[in-house]
């Protein structure tokens, strides 16, 4: 049979740790005995993390290669449901593994001859993480509130139509986003007004 690390491909040929192997094993089992077999066969993950959100709850973040993100999102709803059953109700989120390139300064400009693409900037990566996080719901608006002590709070407006599906997870989303980017975020489902 396949080894437990068959579904995980780490950068620089590193070995997956125990938790990542567990996630990889769960994906393999799903591939073997579920109707997701055809879609899962081509897909792999790059990393997995378990973090604490909101006190005692734990969430699992699964990082996937950017080119495979679309394929994962096609089966994400069913995949998340199966994985959450396996890991006893821990929330599971899929996020693409993106790189942030440093801002070119006067000194560093000579090293990298190529211009830094927009998709590798900090802002673009953080926005993309947010979009991956709330999938299948859609972000319909964003407000950044700067408080008097110059701390920022990002208010993210999600699609009201998806409220029933994702409302119970918004605390997890906020915790995961804070852990990955260090930014505070609040999710809302506003009534639509013109």
UniProtKB/Swiss-Prot annotation:
Keywords: Cytoplasm, Cytoskeleton, Nucleus, Ribonucleoprotein, Ribosomal protein. Its main location: cytoplasm. One of its GO terms (biological process) is translation. GO terms for molecular function: structural constituent of ribosome. One of its GO terms (cellular component) is centrosome. It is found in: Cytoplasm, Cytoskeleton, Microtubule organizing center, Centrosome; Cytoplasm; Nucleus. The keyword Cytoplasm applies. Coiled coil: none annotated. The keyword Nucleus applies. Component of the small ribosomal subunit. The ribosome is a large ribonucleoprotein complex responsible for the synthesis of proteins in the cell. Required for rRNA maturation. PANTHER family: 40S RIBOSOMAL PROTEIN S7 (PTHR11278), SMALL RIBOSOMAL SUBUNIT PROTEIN ES7 (PTHR11278:SF0). Component of the small ribosomal subunit. Belongs to the eukaryotic ribosomal protein eS7 family. This is Small ribosomal subunit protein eS7. It comes from Ictalurus punctatus (Channel catfish). The gene is rps7.
């Amino acid at each position: 049979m396949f080894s437990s690390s068959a579904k995980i491909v780490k950068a620089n040929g590193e070995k997956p740790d125990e938790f990542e192997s567990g996630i990889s094993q769960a994906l393999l089992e799903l591939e073997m005995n579920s109707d997701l077999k055809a879609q899962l066969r081509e897909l792999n993950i790059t990393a997995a993390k378990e973090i604490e959100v909101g006190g005692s709850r734990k969430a699992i973040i699964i990082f996937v290669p950017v080119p495979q993100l679309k394929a994962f999102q096609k089966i994400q709803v069913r995949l998340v449901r199966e994985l959450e059953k396996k890991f006893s109700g821990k929330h599971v989120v899929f996020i693409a593994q993106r790189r942030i390139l440093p801002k070119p300064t006067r000194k560093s400009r000579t090293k990298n001859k190529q211009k830094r693409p927009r998709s590798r900037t900090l802002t673009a990566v953080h926005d993309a993480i947010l979009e991956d996080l709330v999938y299948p719901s859609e972000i319909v608006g964003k407000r950044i509130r700067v408080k008097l002590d110059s701390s920022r709070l990002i208010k993210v407006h999600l699609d009201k139509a998806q409220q029933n599906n994702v409302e119970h997870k918004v605390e997890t989303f906020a915790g995961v986003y804070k852990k990955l980017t260090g930014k505070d975020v609040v999710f809302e489902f506003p009534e639509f007004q013109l």
